Amino acid sequence: MRIGEIVEKLGLEHVCGDLNVEVEHGFTCDLLSEVLGKAQPSTLWITVQSHVNIVAVATVVGIKGIILCNGHEYERETIDKARENGIVLLKSSENSFMVSGKVYELGLR
């Protein structure tokens, strides 16, 4: 599914990155080591972490996009690194549980 479709259907805020990127999986976690060990490539990652290390983790794993929940803001350095590495950054005012359920309903597993 195109990330742009997910943005439209869930009313997410687009921060940076190519909305035409395709994702196949969803993954919700705030522990970076867990994401490194368990997330799959071509994933949309749902989290409350906003620091620059999330971009490094996403790049290593092959995660295509990140949804930051609970109305949190990305750090400037995170946005800059995401642009450099082609990672899509999105935001939601909803909590991770609600966003995860909606992403699941769209068919990402």
Where are the regions that the model predicts?
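Feature captures the catalytic cores and cofactor-binding loops of soluble hydro-lyases/lyases
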Residues: 23, 32-44, 48-109
